[in-house]
Amino acid sequence: MKKNIIVLGAQWGDEGKGKVIDFLSKNINYVVRCQGGNNAGHTVVIKEEKTVLHLLPSSILNKNTINIISSGVVISPIDLVKEINMIEKKGISIKNRILISELCPLVLKYHVSMDVAREKNRKKKEIDSIGTTHRGIGPAYEDKIARRALRIHHLINKDKFKKKLKNIVEYYNFQLINYYKEQPVNHEKIFNELINKSKLLNNISIDIPSYLNSINKKNKSIIFEGAQGALLDIDYGTYPYVTSSNTTVGGIISSTGISPFSIKYILGIIKAYSTRVGNGPFPTEIFDETKNIILEKGKEFGSTTGRKRRIGWFDAVAVKRVIQINSFSGFCLTKIDVLDNIKEIKICTSYILPNGKILDNISNIDDWNKAKPIYKSMPGWLSKTKGVKNFKNLPILAKNYIKKLQSIIKIPIEIISTGSDRNDIIVLNKKLVE
């Protein structure tokens, strides 16, 4: 049966998309990474061996998949080549298995320098920093919107590319030197580094919309992989504490050129609790010892930055907002095992503002910053769920928690992850893996 599936994070990222896509792609031959850059970190664990992917689709470890990067992704050529080399060192062939949109914007040294300079400047002026990953992602997307981005296809004509590069570097150096008082970047050095990578990039770059539509006509199935999470969307997230791309369904459609009518299922990934990296509102944040228990057991450290993630209870208000925008067909609930030793587990069912107003939905930063959670408390199950592969074998209180979440968000939970390994999983909707 043909099934085109979109897989999206439905919180602030780090929900476990990598594992789920790796699992689902065993039966699907095409996986498309749709937005973001090497600020994302998707982790796949196979027999206790961890692989962290920043640019390549999370299906790359499945040897039968074709792994595609669409034009919504900003590409650091140096980091992409490093990642390809890392995969090959694991003994996994990538020959004829990676394709990149010729329209992907490049992330280059001056983007990184600008990103770092801005964050440093915000701290100096005592302005709240965004908490970026310092990977140059924001400036790269700015270039795309300003119509000055260098893209993969520009590498074909080296003379034209060098001229464009020189002009852009002059633009960035003016700001770095005169406003931020930082060191300039050298366009010759950037050019020479890129030329060494250009042959590989040109060999695997194609027109992605035409390719994907040809797959559709052959009745083949495709997974579309989102990065980050819907609450970090540039339009609908906790702006300005968001990423620089559209992390929602609309971003998938626009970055791939695929028809929305060809999508058969939209799978949201949610943790059994909440986390976020960096600054920004986080109404259910935990500050007592429970935070440290979840942090350590859940290994909640950023796969890209290594920073400790902020920990919070499950926020049903935020998730219901994301459901509005993405029309999820079902959810995968991850990291249920991390809560195995927690005596009391809380679910945020609504917010209250200082004026006493109760909110069941929220859309702007002013309300986010003032909102306090109203909780529904449930008893923890205090027994092992890790590695359980059948729903009936879960502790009764764990089942109750899952059923309560489902009754609040009113979308079926159809997959449950019970550990970090690709096989620690319960599939309730068997059609997703047929």
Swiss-Prot record:
<dbReference type="InterPro" id="IPR027417">
    <property type="entry name" value="P-loop_NTPase"/>
</dbReference>
<dbReference type="GO" id="GO:0005737">
    <property type="term" value="C:cytoplasm"/>
</dbReference>
<dbReference type="InterPro" id="IPR042109">
    <property type="entry name" value="Adenylosuccinate_synth_dom1"/>
</dbReference>
<dbReference type="GO" id="GO:0005525">
    <property type="term" value="F:GTP binding"/>
</dbReference>
<feature type="binding site">
    <location>
        <begin position="335"/>
        <end position="337"/>
    </location>
    <ligand>
        <name>GTP</name>
    </ligand>
</feature>
<dbReference type="InterPro" id="IPR042111">
    <property type="entry name" value="Adenylosuccinate_synth_dom3"/>
</dbReference>
<comment type="function">
    <text>Plays an important role in the de novo pathway of purine nucleotide biosynthesis. Catalyzes the first committed step in the biosynthesis of AMP from IMP.</text>
</comment>
<feature type="binding site" description="in other chain">
    <location>
        <position position="133"/>
    </location>
    <ligand>
        <name>IMP</name>
    </ligand>
</feature>
<comment type="similarity">
    <text>Belongs to the adenylosuccinate synthetase family.</text>
</comment>
<dbReference type="GO" id="GO:0004019">
    <property type="term" value="F:adenylosuccinate synthase activity"/>
</dbReference>
<comment type="subunit">
    <text>Homodimer.</text>
</comment>
<dbReference type="GO" id="GO:0046040">
    <property type="term" value="P:IMP metabolic process"/>
</dbReference>
<feature type="binding site">
    <location>
        <begin position="13"/>
        <end position="19"/>
    </location>
    <ligand>
        <name>GTP</name>
    </ligand>
</feature>
<dbReference type="GO" id="GO:0000287">
    <property type="term" value="F:magnesium ion binding"/>
</dbReference>
<keyword id="KW-0479">Metal-binding</keyword>
<dbReference type="Pfam" id="PF00709">
    <property type="entry name" value="Adenylsucc_synt"/>
</dbReference>
<keyword id="KW-0342">GTP-binding</keyword>
<feature type="binding site" description="in other chain">
    <location>
        <begin position="39"/>
        <end position="42"/>
    </location>
    <ligand>
        <name>IMP</name>
    </ligand>
</feature>
<protein>
    <recommendedName>
        <fullName>Adenylosuccinate synthetase</fullName>
        <ecNumber>6.3.4.4</ecNumber>
    </recommendedName>
</protein>
<keyword id="KW-0658">Purine biosynthesis</keyword>
<dbReference type="GO" id="GO:0044208">
    <property type="term" value="P:'de novo' AMP biosynthetic process"/>
</dbReference>
<feature type="binding site">
    <location>
        <position position="147"/>
    </location>
    <ligand>
        <name>IMP</name>
    </ligand>
</feature>
<feature type="active site" description="Proton donor">
    <location>
        <position position="42"/>
    </location>
</feature>
<feature type="binding site">
    <location>
        <begin position="41"/>
        <end position="43"/>
    </location>
    <ligand>
        <name>GTP</name>
    </ligand>
</feature>
<dbReference type="InterPro" id="IPR033128">
    <property type="entry name" value="Adenylosuccin_syn_Lys_AS"/>
</dbReference>
<dbReference type="InterPro" id="IPR001114">
    <property type="entry name" value="Adenylosuccinate_synthetase"/>
</dbReference>
<comment type="pathway">
    <text>Purine metabolism; AMP biosynthesis via de novo pathway; AMP from IMP: step 1/2.</text>
</comment>
<feature type="binding site" description="in other chain">
    <location>
        <position position="307"/>
    </location>
    <ligand>
        <name>IMP</name>
    </ligand>
</feature>
<dbReference type="InterPro" id="IPR042110">
    <property type="entry name" value="Adenylosuccinate_synth_dom2"/>
</dbReference>
<keyword id="KW-0547">Nucleotide-binding</keyword>
<feature type="active site" description="Proton acceptor">
    <location>
        <position position="14"/>
    </location>
</feature>
<feature type="binding site">
    <location>
        <begin position="303"/>
        <end position="309"/>
    </location>
    <ligand>
        <name>substrate</name>
    </ligand>
</feature>
<feature type="binding site">
    <location>
        <position position="309"/>
    </location>
    <ligand>
        <name>GTP</name>
    </ligand>
</feature>
<feature type="binding site" description="in other chain">
    <location>
        <position position="243"/>
    </location>
    <ligand>
        <name>IMP</name>
    </ligand>
</feature>
<feature type="binding site" description="in other chain">
    <location>
        <begin position="14"/>
        <end position="17"/>
    </location>
    <ligand>
        <name>IMP</name>
    </ligand>
</feature>
<keyword id="KW-0963">Cytoplasm</keyword>
<feature type="binding site">
    <location>
        <begin position="417"/>
        <end position="419"/>
    </location>
    <ligand>
        <name>GTP</name>
    </ligand>
</feature>
<feature type="binding site">
    <location>
        <position position="14"/>
    </location>
    <ligand>
        <name>Mg(2+)</name>
    </ligand>
</feature>
<dbReference type="InterPro" id="IPR018220">
    <property type="entry name" value="Adenylosuccin_syn_GTP-bd"/>
</dbReference>
<keyword id="KW-0436">Ligase</keyword>
<feature type="binding site">
    <location>
        <position position="41"/>
    </location>
    <ligand>
        <name>Mg(2+)</name>
    </ligand>
</feature>
<keyword id="KW-0460">Magnesium</keyword>
